Structure formats: C-alpha cells, structure tokens
Amino acid sequence: MGVPAFFRWLSRKYPSIIVNCVEEKPKECNGVKIPVDASKPNPNDVEFDNLYLDMNGIIHPCTHPEDKPAPKNEDEMMVAIFEYIDRLFSIVRPRRLLYMAIDGVAPRAKMNQQRSRRFRASKEGMEAAVEKQRVREEILAKGGFLPPEEIKERFDSNCITPGTEFMDNLAKCLRYYIADRLNNDPGWKNLTVILSDASAPGEGEHKIMDYIRRQRAQPNHDPNTHHCLCGADADLIMLGLATHEPNFTIIREEFKPNKPKPCGLCNQFGHEVKDCEGLPREKKGKHDELADSLPCAEGEFIFLRLNVLREYLERELTMASLPFTFDVERSIDDWVFMCFFVGNDFLPHLPSLEIRENAIDRLVNIYKNVVHKTGGYLTESGYVNLQRVQMIMLAVGEVEDSIFKKRKDDEDSFRRRQKEKRKRMKRDQPAFTPSGILTPHALGSRNSPGSQVASNPRQAAYEMRMQNNSSPSISPNTSFTSDGSPSPLGGIKRKAEDSDSEPEPEDNVRLWEAGWKQRYYKNKFDVDAADEKFRRKVVQSYVEGLCWVLRYYYQGCASWKWYYPFHYAPFASDFEGIADMPSDFEKGTKPFKPLEQLMGVFPAASGNFLPPSWRKLMSDPDSSIIDFYPEDFAIDLNGKKYAWQGVALLPFVDERRLRAALEEVYPDLTPEETRRNSLGGDVLFVGKHHPLHDFILELYQTGSTEPVEVPPELCHGIQGKFSLDEEAILPDQIVCSPVPMLRDLTQNTVVSINFKDPQFAEDYIFKAVMLPGARKPAAVLKPSDWEKSSNGRQWKPQLGFNRDRRPVHLDQAAFRTLGHVMPRGSGTGIYSNAAPPPVTYQGNLYRPLLRGQAQIPKLMSNMRPQDSWRGPPPLFQQQRFDRGVGAEPLLPWNRMLQTQNAAFQPNQYQMLAGPGGYPPRRDDRGGRQGYPREGRKYPLPPPSGRYNWN
C-alpha cells in the first residue's frame, strides 16, 4: 500500500496489537543441522489453521537483500527462498492449509504504480553504477586499496514480474520444494498446500483474499478458522479487517531502521559508496576466518493481532445517541475506507491529508462529528454512499487552508531547530582534534571510515620522521592540520554538503499562501483553476477510484481496465456534487497477458526479458510506441524532500495503441514464450497421509476430463473444483530437482492437481459481516470500567496469545544451583551489602552478638525457595517481638558491640572489594526505621506491618 508510514503510525497508536514471535531455532549436532520439528505444539501458545504467504514479500529480500551480500546466482536465490519459508513455517506451524501466492498480472489500475516503480529502479540502478565507477576511479587514482571488481551481471529486480523466465523457473522450484517437504517434513504431514504462481492473474495478497471470501461463502466453512497472513505491505492490515474473520493475525519481519549495509565498492560496513576511502580491510580472526561474517543479527518476526486492533477501533468508533443502530462491523469498514484518502497503490493521496500529520485521526473526528448529518454509514459490503462521503470531504475542505499553513509552520520550526542543533554541535567541537596514524583510537572504532591504526608504531614513527626530513622548508606563516601536514594558505573550499543549511527544493505551488488552488492546478495539471469542467473531471475520476478500490478490497476486481488517468489528486474542497456521479464499471473485462504487461511496465533497459522483436519496439526510433519508454523522466518532489517521495512523471500507456503494435510481433513468439504468455491457475498438493490423497489418485487413474467437485469433508471444508494437471507430480515418479545443489526425490508419495475456487455470478455480493457461529476471542485490552468493577483487583496485562500462560518457574534444584554458584556478596537487593545485626534474639531479650556465634542466622522454615540464594533477611524480620518483655540495658556491653562492628568492617570490605581493592557503595539504609546503626542506645523497634513472610 502506498502509505510507507502507516504501520509505524498504527503500531504507535495501538501498541498492544504487536506480539514478538517465539522462534525455535534449528540445532546442530556434530556438524549435522537438526531442523525444527513443526509437528510439535506452537511455542507461541496459539495454534494456527491456515498460513498464507504473499510470496513477493519473500522473493525480493531473498534475491537482492539490503543488509548482506546478495546471492551469487539464481540457484542460491532459490535456496534462500526455501530457507525463508522454512523459518516462517516453523514459527506459525499451520495445521490445515498453506497457501503460497505469487503476484500475477495486475489490474490496469496497479500497472501505473508498477510502471513507475520499475522505471525508477532502472534509473536509480544506472545512476548508482555510474557513481560507483566514478568513486572507484578516484580512489585508485589516489593510491587507495579496493578489492578487484567482480565481473558479474547485475541482478535486475525487474525480472520479478510475471512472464519472465525467472518467475517461470521459480514456479518449478516451488513445486519441487513443496513435494520435498510433504515427503520428508513431519510438520507438513496432513497439510493441504495450494500454489498460485505468477501465471494466475491477480496480485498475491488479493488472490489470498479472494480465496478466503469464496470459502467463507460456502456452508461447510469453519467460521472460527485461525488465519495467519505473512507480508509487510500496509494494505494487508486493511484486507485482514475487510474479511471480518474473528481470528486473523499478520506475521511480518520486524523493521529495524539504520541497519548496517556493506559498501558497494569495498564490501566493508560503516560507510556508503560516496564516503569510501579505499582503506584495506582489517583482518577478522587470527587467520581471517571471519571475513564473511556480518555484523547484523538475523531479523526477528512479530505478530500483528487484528482481533486486538478491532478492540481498539470498537472503542474509538463507538458513538452514543446515534439516529441508527451502531454496528461495529460497518464502522470498521468505514475506517478502512477513510484510510484510502491518505494513500494507496491505485490513487495519490489528497494534498491536505498526510499520514505523518495524523490525517486518519482527523478524518475519524470529522466522521464522528457529522454522523448525525449523514444518518448512516459510508459503506456497505464494498459499495460507497457518495452523498455521505461528500459531507465528510467538504468538512475536510473547510480546514484545508489551516492545514497547509500549519504544515508550513511545522516545517519552518523543524528547520530552525536543526540549524540551531548544527550550530550548537559546531560550537561544542574542540579547537584541535588529533588525527593521524599514531593517534589513539577507541576500541571498536577501527572499522570507521577514515580511521588509520598503526600496526607497528615504531615503524610508523620512523616513516613520519623520514617524511618530515625529506619535505621542503616551510615558512613560519604556514598553518598545519591536526596530523602535522601543512595546509594551503588559502584554506580548503568548503563542500556544498558541509553547508549549515541544506538547499530546499523549489516549491512553485506554495500551498500556505493565498491563491494556492489556482497555482496547484496550473503547475500540476497545466490548466486554469477556473476551468470547472476539468476540475470536475479530475474529481469524478478520483471518486471512481475510491469506489473501485473499495470494491477491490471487498468483492474482487470490478474492472481490469479502469485506472486513474492523472498523476495528482484534487482537493477535498472540490468534492462538490459527487453524490450524482456514476460509480459503475465495465463488466466482462479481461486481464493483460503476462508479456503484454511486461511491455506496459518495463523500461527499455529491462527489455532483455522480452522476445527480441518485442524488445525492438522499446528502442527503435521508428516504433509506434517509442514514446512509452523515455530514457529519462522528471521527478516532481511535490513538496517533499527526497526523490523517492516524489512523483515520477511518466506518460500513461495507451492500451489500444499497445495492443495494435503487439499484433505485428505476436507471430514471432516461440512455443516456450507462448506458454509463458498464457494465463494459468492454482495447483493443490497433498501427501500420502492426507485424506484427499487417494481421491485425487483415483481421478488420475480414471482419466476424468471434466472438473470434479472437491469433497469438503476430506479437507477441512475447502470447496472448489479439481481438474487434471498436465505437469502433475504423481507418486512413484522421480521429482527432478531444478536446483543442481539439491537432490532429486526418488521415493515420492505426493500428488498434485489443478484447483479452482468456487465460482459465483458476476453480480454476487459477498457480505461483509461476521459469520454465524463465529466466536470472538477473549478481550485483551483493559476494560474501561475496570477500576469500578474489579473490586480492587490488579489488572494483569496479556503479553501473548494466551492469558493463562504459565510464567517461567524454576524448581528447588535450580535455586540451589543458583545459590551455590552465586556468592552472597554479589547480590543486588537492598540487604545485599548490609552488615549482620549487632544483636541476636535470645529468649525474650536482645543479647550481644558474641564472636564465637554464627555470623549468618538460621533461615526460616517457611522461606520461599527462590529467596534462599538472595541471602537471609534481617534478623528483626525473622524473630517474633514480644512487647510485654523489657530489654536489658545496653550500656554494659556497648563497648563490646563497637569492637565487634569495627572487626566486621574490614572483613566485609575484603569480601566485597572490587578489582581495584575499593569497597563498593554501601546501601544498608542505615539510620532508617528497622535498620541498625552503630552506637544505637535502644533496642530495635518491632517489625512493621508492611512485611509479610507467611
């Protein structure tokens, strides 16, 4: 989803939705790796039924990772993908279904975003290669050290698009992987696996949602199925809420900013290519055996609990005294719809609504304020009530001017703070900073850019003396740098990037000044704001987009041909008269074919993935569609600071012209290219232990050519139709490995078959409601009336999936072990450094502690085992105090008491002294009530009621 900061905003506003995954790691014994047994209970105290993998979120980080060296070839990429899936599977451990969905041909509305992203990737890749070569030449010219440049072909991530050879090979590798795991992994024993590869049209996450919607509409569906969806896109959260399933969880890799990345030139960490100085790499390990080790740890996974998010939203959206019945499911649908205004993959966000400015909170407040005017909800099962939406947008339009002014004030304030911070840091810098080879360096800073550490100080000093002796005479007026070398009299010209103030991008619109609407339409659309007809056309297209996106989320693709034909969005104040705008879409549209989509989204630099005659249309000056593939294009920052936040001003592809040009080159396709250009479907896999195994085998034995209904009683209520697969995996047939480093499967028992979801009429409406029989999970958030209804009980927060999860507990043997290995003096409690009491209780009187008596009192019989290794409590907490008995005068033996305390002090310090021989800080709370102090002339007071040891 086109909201990069959405997940960060969501996790900060609703923190309890996040749960850290408990992951069991594989073990290694005698050099043999022992995988995790996924058939055992889930260590996260929850059992998932279905696991859905949005595979593109796995393919990209495995093929071109940012925080580690990339795989050397395609085979290593496939193995990395297999290992990533294994890791996810061992965390989630699904019991019924594993659904793998790879992005297929996308709707036309998404192709514009894909086109922009791929053109940007190609442009940035070429610019990075040019910059890398320039820095390399500069470093080598200065005598720097760089490893020899590897002659290898740069991996073009644009090949991760339907129709390429890479995606076709990936589908074959995943078929082999599924067969291998179903044959050999006990955790996959009774699992149903569905693979929807790139030949099946649709985005991966929407293919998953379409499967869930169609299964929910079946009478045999279990309404309490626990779903787990893997993916990092923000729209997965919206899609999960749109299912109205009570048990829906998202697993994603935890994002950790500022991860170390290796330099593209020297492969060292700590600097980028532009800062590389060509310094030799420091040896890691005695024999450089740790050269390939990475400083970054393996990424961790987190769970996002949508049932907890539903609790948050129910509290936030609940309204009293409504003119209609409150329905939390409908209000959540409205919340999902309002999130579309701050951005998505199909529409640009409104200029006045930024996620970083709490735009969603603003929309929710307006939504609750005008609900009495609207008289109902904004949406119903994916269909929009435009009359009510108009009231919301006009209310936003009334505050647009103040939003723009506040945004400008906040930006100016931020720049002032940054400028003052730079001045303060510059002022606090020391006047002289030592540098050079002999300068002391902090531990661990040898890998920092620019650091030079002398391995032989004596030799380095000798070389410096010889260099000074051989240098020409220097005038007295010559200035020196910190390392002793003369600096030019004229000084060094300061670089542009060293300036105190960074140049701000030119903004011709100036939304914070009067006349902002006229300037916006003139600069962005090249029309006058007074052109009411054009403005209404832009608004109508945007309203159509809102209806299309909501229908896409709740009902499926309404039209494969529709798209938003502008680069920018209108203002909220322009949403007048939208209630009468049509929101119907052309029916019966078909998706592009894979190679046709490649022609629509690829730049000319990625034409090597296309057939030669098709590729020529991208680069031939005489091509009828050459204008679709500009070599360079402008990026409008649109008020932003960084290029990646800007808008790529690419021409839109005319579908009619594209198809007309491709008709001439279609005959040039080979049979293999024709196969890759065809649309496919899903494939279902089961092992020999699955109840469906024998049923599918019988279909192959009978050779049935007609689709057959899936028996739901054999596969947990899954319904659809089976048809025979021409490339099926069958028992007793060898499954050849497409990856040379992996072995063939000679004893296969897995069977595969084509699978098709249940089909419905084109005008069928999937109801956005919670199904009958669905049980909501137990509430996780603290009840708002807990203080009134708890009768003084303390609230116990739920940290994981199970509220009754047993806490970690050690038995008495473990406490004895801890008490044995931990010295008494190393305790950290308030009594750890306290001296023994000066008196001990004998009979009913306090007596002096004689030298021959034991220094440690006897432990109480009812002491908890976990307290035994912490040392005994003070004596006055152990003994019963009798108020009716007097105390002996302490004066006769006060001298003995002082002598005894004086004798104890050296022993205590000798026992607790640190490495330097100095005693630690005493923390015996001397002088407070209940704690002894030297020279006290009265008996200790009775114990207070705050201590209870029973």
Swiss-Prot record:
Tissues where the protein occurs: Expressed in the spleen, thymus, prostate, testis, ovary, small intestine, colon, peripheral blood leukocytes, heart, brain, placenta, lung, liver, skeletal muscle, kidney, and pancreas. Isoform 2 is expressed predominantly in peripheral blood leukocytes.
Positions of modified residues (Asymmetric dimethylarginine): R824, R847, R851, R880, R883, R946
Residues that bear Phosphoserine: S448, S471, S473, S475, S482, S487, S499, S501, S678
Modified residues (Phosphothreonine): T439
GO MF terms, alphabetically ordered: 3'-5'-RNA exonuclease activity; 5'-3' exonuclease activity; 5'-3' RNA exonuclease activity; identical protein binding; nuclease activity; RNA binding; transcription termination site sequence-specific DNA binding; zinc ion binding
Keyword field: Acetylation, DNA-binding, Exonuclease, Hydrolase, Metal-binding, Methylation, mRNA processing, Nuclease, Nucleus, Phosphoprotein, Transcription, Transcription regulation, Transcription termination, Zinc, Zinc-finger
The enzyme's E.C. designation: 3.1.13.-
Polar residues biased stretches: 445-458
Regions of compositional bias (Low complexity) in chain numbering: 468-482
GO biological process: hippocampus development; mRNA processing; neuron differentiation; nuclear-transcribed mRNA catabolic process; retina development in camera-type eye; RNA catabolic process; RNA metabolic process; RNA processing
Post-translational modification N6-acetyllysine, affected residues: K286
Superkingdom, taxonomy of origin: Eukaryota
Zinc finger (CCHC-type) in chain: 262-278
Location of this chain's protein in the cell: Nucleus, Nucleolus
Alphabetical list of InterPro entries matching this protein: 5_3_exoribonuclease, Xrn1_helical, Xrn1_N, Xrn2/3/4
Region described as Disordered: spans on this chain: 408-508, 911-950
GO CC annotation, single: nucleolus
Paired cysteines (S-S): none
Top-level enzyme category: hydrolase
Positions with biased composition (Basic and acidic residues): 920-937
Subunit structure: Interacts with POLR2A and SMN1/SMN2. Interacts with CDKN2AIP and NKRF. Interacts with CDKN2AIPNL; the interaction is direct. Interacts with TRIM71 (via NHL repeats) in an RNA-dependent manner. Interacts with DHX34; the interaction is RNA-independent.
Protein name: 5'-3' exoribonuclease 2
Gene that this sequence comes from: XRN2
